[in-house]
């Protein structure tokens, strides 16, 4: 096996070690599984879907595990876990294509593997992990396609299919779709407007994604058992019309939630989302979608650095990393949807990891290897610290309830308390 093959296998195994064990706990649907897992079963039973506010692809994939192994907790989480595992080698390939060295790509991949939200989303039957997988796959295929002097039909067709899967999973993939369009134009430049390139661009960015999106609704169309072509055409038109209802739902959603988090607070981890909580006897168990603080708190400055330095030094690799983060994050500020959660930032975090990988690699190259080593150790330590509440491990009540002593400090006219926080709950908003 080649070195690249060994590295890809290694990161996949590392991802699997944290995603497959204990996949059957909790033993019931929790958080949005009450919608997505249930909808997967309904597709299998030919029933109208409970959850229709996202396109069908993710629920159909979740249904694959249920079809094979029954409606069991580990079965409806199996395909999301496999998607989470697959993200690791896909991202390594993407990082290797984008970043200047293999070491930088490994830094970026290890950082992503140690992110808490990425782990939690890989162990729950929700749509987010599939969106990330298909978006990263699409970007990898795009960079491969545009690197050739002449666009190849097979490469552009593969890109179109992957983009279709991303868009038919979550509409938030439109952010990634727009970013990929900019990358395509930036790399191809004038060549993008040649007749052949225009045709292939339309195929991969419009025609095939639209076709895949429509095909994802075929199981829903078939639920009414249409007996003729005319009936199928009517159902297809109904599926198209349904998109207006999806938009209306998100645009006018005025519900409230305990863990609502404004979009501009996400990089600061102001309000992570608790998905599950159980307290019984001497132990507690919980699952919280909390990003690794060392990664999320660094994501904004690292992306600003990549964008600014990339523009100054005319380094398209760094511009790509920084722009990817902001173009997948900032559109949330324009979204009409008001009920949002911090884990939505997950789709932008891989690009922050690319920026961090590039930054760590530069420090290494100038003889400051101690800095990337110390940072990686800190990231790993925080990942292991929060791991019990990323995977619902039993934690003694005494440890959960423990609080470090607080010390009152006078700062001018203000009196603040230093300390008084828990081992896992550093701020009141984390509870």
Residues covered by each model-derived region:
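Membrane-interface transmembrane helices that cradle and orient dolichyl/undecaprenyl
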Residues: 1, 97-99, 138-158, 166, ...
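Transmembrane-helix signature of polytopic, membrane-embedded enzymes
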Residues: 5-11, 91-114, 133, 147-154, ...
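Short helix- or helix-capping micro-motifs
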Residues: 12-18, 108-113, 120, 140, ...
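Transmembrane-helix motifs of polytopic, lipid-linked glycan transferases
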Residues: 13, 74, 78-99, 137-141, ...
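Aromatic-rich transmembrane-lumenal/periplasmic boundary elements in polytopic membrane proteins
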Residues: 26-39, 209-265, 269, 393-413
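Short acidic/glycine- and proline-prone juxtamembrane loop motifs at membrane-interface regions
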Residues: 30-31, 80, 117-131
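Specific aromatic-rich, kink-prone transmembrane helix
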Residues: 44, 90, 130-149, 155-163, ...
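Transmembrane helical bundles and short interhelical boundary loops of multi-pass, membrane-embedded
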Residues: 198-205, 209, 213-214, 218-223, ...
